[in-house]
């Protein structure tokens, strides 16, 4: 097993590898120096969808960049394409379709979330993304994936759709229940393993226990960040899912990735601690569910999903003036 210290050192090297990280942000003068950060969490992402729909409806869209991990990357697409309600519609309309997310899909395709169905059929036909609006929006988008070879986060610059949709798929490919996504010679899985809430990358800060800042070539760090998380304030993470992934022995050929899995819970809690410290300093504003979130990874209850969506809307509406003041 590779040590956590070795993984951190490798993270420093890989984070400076331009091939992994994308290109410069837009110099558009109409954008603020505020980044929008979206945590993942499978169907918990419908909370984020509720927040984002209110921001879009109220014209609170002045972000220089959006950074999404897993479901956060999926939500980023509809926010950048200016399609209010799309992310919510997709989760509600297709929750019972076995092609969308099911163990049948896992058995037949190797992915619990059907790649062809989600990233081609829905994306292009059933509830199509407005690619023209996405591509013309100067806000930059980064999808956070985990480089399986190095066990480090990769900040994939989603410049154009439909060309870069596999970057979003890479970000949301959960370990043990998804095939690796190969892009430009790299193998990727869900970004949650290595950077669940990518505020440090956006702000150019050290992440959690790391000794060095997250460096992304040609990216000017944002001054502050609005961060949407999908767990309540008192959430404590266990390592049950990561232990399942390790015991599956799927990743014995990738020791750095196994090390990242083994240390994920500790790093996640360190990350949350850092996040709330930054909120106390005024550099970030965190929006979070007011109560523990009970929806499952493959939630089928439309009532539960709609309730969480409405909770996201309420949080955004209740704090709208605070959000506007923070961004300005």
Where are these regions (language model features)?
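Patatin-like phospholipase
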Residues: 1-69, 77-328
């Amino acid at each position: 097993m590779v040590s956590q210290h070795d993984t951190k050192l490798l993270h420093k090297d890989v984070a400076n590898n331009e091939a992994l990280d994308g290109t410069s942000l837009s110099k558009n003068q109409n954008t603020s120096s505020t980044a929008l950060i979206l945590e993942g969490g499978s169907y918990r992402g419908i909370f984020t969808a509720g927040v984002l729909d209110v921001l879009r409806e109220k014209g609170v869209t002045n972000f220089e960049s959006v950074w999404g991990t897993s479901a956060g990357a999926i939500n980023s697409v509809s926010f950048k394409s200016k399609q209010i309600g799309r992310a919510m519609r997709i989760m509600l309309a297709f929750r019972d379709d076995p092609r969308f997310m099911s163990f049948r899909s896992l058995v037949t395709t190797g992915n619990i979330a059907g790649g062809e169905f989600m990233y081609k059929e829905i994306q292009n036909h059933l509830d199509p993304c407005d690619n023209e609006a996405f591509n013309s929006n100067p806000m930059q988008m980064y999808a956070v994936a985990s480089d399986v070879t190095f066990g480090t986060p990769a900040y994939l610059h989603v410049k154009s759709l439909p060309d870069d949709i596999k970057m979003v798929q890479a970000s949301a490919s959960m370990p043990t229940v998804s095939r690796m996504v190969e892009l430009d010679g790299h193998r990727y899985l869900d970004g949650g393993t290595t950077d669940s809430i990518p505020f440090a990358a956006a702000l150019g800060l050290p992440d959690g226990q790391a000794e060095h800042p997250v460096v992304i070539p040609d990216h000017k760090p944002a001054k502050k960040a609005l961060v949407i998380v999908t767990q309540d304030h008192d959430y404590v993470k266990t390592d049950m899912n990561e232990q399942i992934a390790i015991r599956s022995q799927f990743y014995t050929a990738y020791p750095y990735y196994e090390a990242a899995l083994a240390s994920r819970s500790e790093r996640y809690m360190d990350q949350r601690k850092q996040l709330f410290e930054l909120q106390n300093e005024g550099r970030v504003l965190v929006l979070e569910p007011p109560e523990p979130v009970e929806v499952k990874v493959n939630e089928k209850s439309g009532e539960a999903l709609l309730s969480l969506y409405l909770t996201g809307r309420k949080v955004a509406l209740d704090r709208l003036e605070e959000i506007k003041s923070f961004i300005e």
